[in-house]
Regions:
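Nucleotide phosphate-binding/pyrophosphate-handling subdomain across enzymes
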Residues: 2-7, 17-27, 135, 266-371
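Short beta-strand "acidic-cap" motif of Rossmann-like dinucleotide-binding folds
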Residues: 31-35, 137-138, 160, 236, ...
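Phosphate-binding loop of NTP-binding sites
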Residues: 25-26, 47, 64-66, 75-219, ...
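Beta-strand->loop->alpha-helix junctions that form or flank phosphate-binding loops
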Residues: 32-36, 57-60, 95-99, 231-249, ...
Length: 450
């Protein structure tokens, strides 16, 4: 794809926007970048693109869009902006960063999507391949923009990408040679009109599959299990019933059989990650990695040491014999359900944040069964209080510091305090990482005070 002298508008000057500006300018495009934030607040990203000949239009809510050959919004830009729709209607292509990258990807692409577990699975695939002597580049929605990986792809054997539904919506040319869809539970319904529409977005992962390429699907997820039609080899994984091929859990081991290869066993006792949800992530990662040439014995070594990622059901500390867990990444009801099911002890649940039009009643039975008390905060606390009224005692608080103190007061020795918000973080925090780090700091302060 020739970008020389193309007039391209980049929307947003955060990490992806900076990467886009550099990539496009290096290929001779005439780049303009726009951002609603003031020039003063964008000093660092502006420094990173200085000297590239990029036109800046900053502090503008509605930039001039006419006359461009291509418009590329950063991932956080709402796709339904009126002026963006007008640009589309006028015939100007509006691409996501991943769509641009897909025109320059030269190496085999392994992709992972799903409502929950994407980052853990994507990271694990990369580790399994590396341990087997292969050279993966890992990125995408996981943190490193794909466009930033392309300069190093000549040193790699594979690109391994985490792909969100938002990215799939704006990357119609994306063509992975192998892809895993982990699960589909209600999420982002503030953006999609229905769960079916959200599932259709996820199914875009497989739109360009060819006969010899691999689809890895969760047999235990009713929506995901229906998406195996069309070209491509299908390999299912299941945590609740044995299969004749694919990956399944039985007799305290993960069994994995790909095509005509011999069946491999991975004992659960030798896998450091815990919880049924993580065993499903492991099955998907093993399927992708072994199909790509990973060595089973090397994979066993990785599974014995891989401890997961921060803010995903992460043990923080014990205070007065009460265990505190950080599940700040639990931004939807499906993730909270998985986390609550993990514990056999009574849970004091800290929840709330920015709503994504979730149906919180879906986890009401689990709240009644597993939760001793609810500590609610953020924009959704009133709604959550109404939906979960009568299921457990409710305490509403003004901030996370008060939530940690009140949860500690409510808990008894041997019980669990779990931050699993079921909501986005943007009402009070920069992102889920900021929320999780704040929670961990508050717990450590509580621990030292006691």
């Amino acid at each position: 794809m020739d970008l020389k002298d193309k007039k391209i508008l980049v929307i947003g000057l955060a990490r992806t926007g900076v990467a886009l500006c550099r990539f496009l300018a290096e290929r001779g495009a005439r780049v303009t970048v726009t951002d609603m934030a003031s020039p003063a607040s964008l000093a660092e990203p502006r420094r990173q693109i200085a000297g590239l000949g990029i036109t800046e239009e900053l502090g503008i809510a509605r930039p001039r869009w006419q006359g461009y050959d291509l418009i590329i919004p950063s991932p956080g830009v709402p796709p339904e902006l009126v002026w963006l729709n007008r640009a589309r209607e006028s015939g100007i292509p509006v691409w996501g960063e991943l769509e641009l990258a897909s025109h320059f990807i030269e190496k085999p692409l392994l992709a992972v999507s799903g409502t929950n577990g994407k980052t853990t699975t994507t990271t694990l695939v990369g580790e399994l391949l590396k341990a087997s002597g292969l050279r993966p580049l890992v990125g995408g929605n996981i943190g490193t923009p794909v466009i930033s990986l392309l300069a190093r792809q000549h040193q790699a054997d594979f690109l391994v990408l985490e792909v969100s539904s938002f990215q799939l919506d704006t990357a119609p040319s994306l063509h992975p040679q192998a892809a895993a869809l982990l699960n589909i539970t209600p999420d982002h319904l503030d953006r999609y009109p229905s769960l079916a529409a959200y599932a259709a977005s996820k199914a875009g992962l497989f739109r360009h599959m060819r006969e010899n390429e691999l689809k890895v699907l969760n047999a235990g997820d009713k929506l995901v299990a229906t998406l195996g039609g069309g070209p491509g080899r299908v390999s299912f994984f299941s945590s609740n019933r044995p299969l004749t091929r694919g990956a399944w859990l039985a007799d305290e081991s993960i069994h994995l059989k790909l095509d005509d290869a011999k069946e491999e066993l991975f004992p659960v006792a030798d896998i450091r990650l815990s919880g049924c949800h993580n065993l499903e992530n492991v099955m998907a990662a093993l399927t992708l990695a072994l199909d790509a040439g990973a060595v089973p014995e090397a994979c066993r070594r990785v599974l014995a040491s891989f401890q997961g990622l921060p803010h995903r059901l992460e043990f923080v500390a014990e205070v007065d014999r009460v265990a505190f867990y950080d599940d700040s990444k639990g931004t939807n009801v499906g993730a909270v359900a998985v986390s609550l099911a993990y514990f056999s002890k009574p849970v004091i649940l800290i929840a709330g944040g920015r709503d994504k039009d979730s149906d919180f009643s879906l986890i009401s039975p689990l709240i009644r069964e597993r939760v001793k008390a609810l500590v609610l905060l953020g924009e959704t606390q009133e709604r959550l209080s109404q939906v979960w009224k009568g299921l457990a005692p409710i305490c509403q608080v003004k901030d996370l510091a008060e939530a940690v103190r009140r949860a500690h007061d409510l808990a008894r020795p041997g019980e669990v305090v779990l931050l699993s918000p079921a909501c986005a973080s943007f009402d009070m925090f920069k992102d889920y990482v900021h929320r999780g780090e704040t929670f961990q700091r508050l717990v450590k302060e509580l621990q030292h005070a006691n």
